[in-house]
Curated annotation (Swiss-Prot):
SUPFAM superfamilies xrefs: FabD/lysophospholipase-like
Gene Ontology terms, MF aspect: monoacylglycerol lipase activity; nutrient reservoir activity; phospholipase activity
Transport found in the keyword field: no
Source species of the chain: Solanum tuberosum (Potato)
Family statement: Belongs to the patatin family.
This protein's name: Patatin
Glycan-bearing residues: 115
Physiological role: Probable lipolytic acyl hydrolase (LAH), an activity which is thought to be involved in the response of tubers to pathogens.
Lipid metabolism recorded as keyword: yes
GO annotation (BP), single: defense response
Motif (GXSXG): 75-79
PANTHER family: PATATIN GROUP D-2 (PTHR32176:SF85), XYLOSE ISOMERASE (PTHR32176)
């Protein structure tokens, strides 16, 4: 409940900063937000692969990457992992992973990450392989080296406060310049599934800071879109590149929010009679499912309401499958058969209409977004050259 209240407060703070003034022609803050969901991250990975392919086609550049087009990329849990993969630089200062590399990553490493530890008292998985592969892939890279602004959430169980890792916060909170592999493990350390993560950072003045972190979904309830928007709002206010924006208007904001699928069409429903027989563990699992589904719906509702009120509904796109069934609803079923089903879910989702009231498919909407992202990037490059 407290998390929901904080979301509402943040939402209305963002709303209060907007105005109905016309946007400066061509200037736009672009935001990508990716939900949590374990192995279901395959679904947004399919969407990202399609979008990056469209950007490469529109700009006739096979080396185009998502980080070249988005001012803010935010994620929680598996969405935080995707965020790191597409923003962490390689030795050539380019993203170490293209969008097309993400699904193969899940197929190669998912079965080892979600390999039952055998413990009946501790977490379902020991997390050792996950941490190992993150260290191998992300190396010693820290937040400040990300190729664009990031927003990755976690929750500190010692201070009982959310921890948000962003580049823009480092000047006032240098202790947050953590290694990306520590951040990625922390945001993915879902209670029950993985152990919490402890690490320390050291600032230039010799201070040491301790972190005891769990899944970012504890802080953002699975959907980090509001968090990503708040970071984008701050970026627009503080970054000289956006000096032409006097007061942020939603005509100047482009938000793409990717879900990992829900069963909110009620494949799993319960009656009061059934729930009356549940013990604490059964309630914990059910509450997690219910909370994730409800928060995903409500966050989308909050944001879409604001964009519509500002006559900017075409600047917000939520890509979500709301009718997962069977094994595809499970965040930790990394069997090859289930991962293949998740690929099919993502590919089928592209062909579905964005809403019941619109004939536009997600594929068509993403092509439209790719054109907007390309135009905005070219305009900014032209301004910079003059």
């Amino acid at each position: 409940m407290a998390t929901t209240k904080s979301f509402l407060i943040l939402f209305f703070m963002i709303l209060a900063t907007t105005s109905s003034t016309c946007a400066t022609l061509g200037e736009m803050v672009t935001v990508l937000s990716i939900d949590g969901g374990g192995i279901k991250g395959i679904i947004p990975a399919i969407i990202l692969e399609f979008l990056e392919g469209q950007l490469q086609e529109v700009d006739n550049n096979k080396d185009a990457r998502l980080a070249d087009y988005f001012d803010v990329i935010g994620g929680t849990s598996t969405g935080g992992l995707l965020t790191a993969m597409i923003t962490t630089p390689n030795e050539n200062n380019r993203p170490f992973a293209a969008a097309k590399d993400i699904v193969p990553f899940y197929f190669e490493h998912g079965p080892h990450i979600f390999n039952y530890s055998g413990s009946i008292f501790g977490p379902r998985y020991d997390g050792k392989y996950l941490l190992q592969v993150l260290q191998e892939k992300l190396g010693e890279t820290r937040v400040h080296q990300a190729l664009t602004e990031v927003a990755i959430s976690s929750f500190d169980i010692k201070t009982n406060k959310p921890v948000i890792f962003t580049k823009s916060n480092l000047a006032e909170s240098p202790q947050l310049d953590a290694k990306m592999y520590d951040i990625c493990y922390s945001t993915a350390a879902a209670p029950i599934y993985f152990p919490p993560h402890h690490f320390v950072t050291h600032t230039s003045n010799g201070a040491t800071y301790e972190f005891n972190l769990v899944d970012g979904a504890v802080a953002t309830v699975g959907d980090p879109a509001l968090l990503s928007l708040s970071v984008a709002t701050r970026l627009a206010q503080d970054d000289p590149a956006f000096s032409s924006i006097k007061s942020l208007d939603y005509k100047q904001m482009l938000l793409l929010s990717l879900g990992t699928g829900t069963n909110s069409e009620f494949d799993k429903t319960y009656t009061a009679e059934e729930a009356a027989k549940w013990g604490p563990l059964r309630w914990m699992l059910a509450i997690q499912q219910m909370t994730n589904a409800a928060s995903s719906y409500m966050t989308d509702y909050y944001i879409s309401t604001v964009f519509q009120a500002r006559h900017s509904q075409n600047n917000y796109l939520r890509v979500q499958e709301n009718a997962l069934t069977g094994t595809t609803t499970e965040m930790d079923d990394a069997s090859e058969a289930n991962m293949e089903l998740l690929v099919q879910v993502g590919e089928t989702l592209l062909k579905k209409p964005v809403s019941k009231d619109s004939p536009e498919t997600y594929e068509e909407a993403l092509k439209r977004f790719a054109k907007l992202l390309s135009d905005r990037k070219k305009l900014r490059a032209n301004k910079a050259s003059h």
